[in-house]
């Protein structure tokens, strides 16, 4: 990567900020409806993503339970898992009444279960199919259709591989790419290990922005603080800046960092809710919507008091 900065460029300002300036990643068993309600209490501007929802679940399951997005104001994206263009188009149409601002195709999950369904990271090995999926989804909605992907698959981790993948999908009309800056290893690593073992190569995001200047490029991968987000957004390489940053585990491990997003990244006033008030609001939301469920998802509220003087 060329580290020569271009002094004439200025940092992103709120008036010109990309809609994808700050995003919270789709995370299985985490970013369900109560979690997104919780996140929205902390940031008005951040873009929130659902858990991945498969096309089969939407066709055969309870759509209100899977897609309900009530009381989660602000920009929210539905992430879909699938590889059949017709089924993805059906899922997009079925989700239309629920008010999502974006439909995202998962091309990054490496889990064996997802691979058996022929979607997730293994889709990167068939860029033409991904392009067909994107075209079908775009034909079914006027909302943005985006793709979240890795920078490589197994031994295919050279820049040319991800560049050609993005190029094929770009030609299908996709203009926003969320780049998880690690390769996916489809054999031999667990999903958790796939988030930690493959080398982090953030430079790929700037290389893609250089080669696809009209695309929105969002960097995902081990981003932990709003200060780090700000620094990454201000970095200039090869004369370009990336358009956005996506955080993952930090959003539930140290969720109070989300309360800094609007001020640090958008120049707006901070939230005034206390941690205790946020916890009370989330508990009321969970009681209202999930009192009848027979399972309990892990809650990001568990991290609200982390790093406080009285916390362990």
PLM-predicted stretches and their roles:
Residues 90-94, 160-164, 223-243:
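Catalytic cores of alpha/beta
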Residues 29, 149-152, 216-227, 249-251:
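Glycine-rich beta-to-alpha transition loops that act as phosphate-gripper elements at the mouths
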Residues 295-302:
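Conserved small/polar residues in nucleotide/adenosyl-binding loops
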Residues 24, 39, 78, 105, ...:
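Conserved, mostly hydrophobic/aromatic
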Residues 5-12, 16, 27-101:
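Glycine-rich, positively charged N-terminal anion/phosphate-binding segment
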Residues 254-269:
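C-terminal helical cap(s) of enzyme catalytic domains, especially alpha/beta-barrels
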Residues 240-258:
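Glycine-rich phosphate-binding active-site loops on the catalytic face of alpha/beta enzymes
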Residues 93-103, 135-211:
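Alpha/beta enzyme core
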């Amino acid at each position: 990567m060329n580290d020569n900065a271009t002094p004439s460029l200025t940092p992103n300002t709120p008036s010109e900020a990309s809609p994808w300036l700050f995003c919270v990643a789709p995370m299985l068993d985490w970013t369900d409806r109560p979690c997104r309600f919780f996140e929205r209490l902390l940031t008005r501007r951040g873009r929130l993503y659902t858990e991945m929802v498969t096309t089969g679940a939407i066709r055969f399951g309870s759509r209100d339970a899977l897609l309900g997005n009530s009381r989660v104001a602000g920009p929210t994206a539905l992430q879909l898992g699938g590889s059949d263009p017709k089924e993805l188009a059906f899922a997009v149409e079925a989700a239309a009444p629920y008010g999502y601002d974006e439909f995202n195709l998962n091309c990054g999950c490496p889990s064996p279960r997802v691979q058996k369904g022929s979607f997730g990271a293994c889709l990167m090995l068939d860029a033409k199919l991904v392009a067909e999926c994107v075209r079908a989804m775009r034909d079914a909605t006027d909302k943005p259709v985006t793709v979240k992907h890795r920078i490589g698959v197994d031994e295919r981790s050279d820049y040319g591989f991800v560049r050609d993948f993005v190029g094929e999908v770009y030609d299908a009309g996709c203009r926003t790419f969320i780049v998880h800056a690690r390769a996916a290893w489809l054999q031999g690593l667990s999903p958790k290990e796939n988030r930690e073992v493959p080398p982090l190569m953030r430079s790929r995001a700037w290389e893609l922005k250089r080669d696809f200047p009209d695309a929105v490029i969002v960097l995902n991968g081990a981003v932990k603080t709003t200060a780090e987000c700000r620094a990454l957004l201000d970095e200039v390489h090869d004369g370009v800046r990336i358009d956005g940053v996506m955080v993952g585990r930090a959003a539930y491990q140290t969720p109070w960092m989300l309360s800094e997003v609007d001020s640090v990244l958008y120049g707006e006033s901070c939230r005034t809710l206390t941690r205790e008030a946020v916890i009370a609001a989330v508990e009321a939301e969970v009681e209202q919507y999930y009192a009848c469920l027979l399972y309990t998802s892990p809650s990001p509220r568990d991290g609200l008091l982390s790093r406080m003087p009285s916390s362990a």
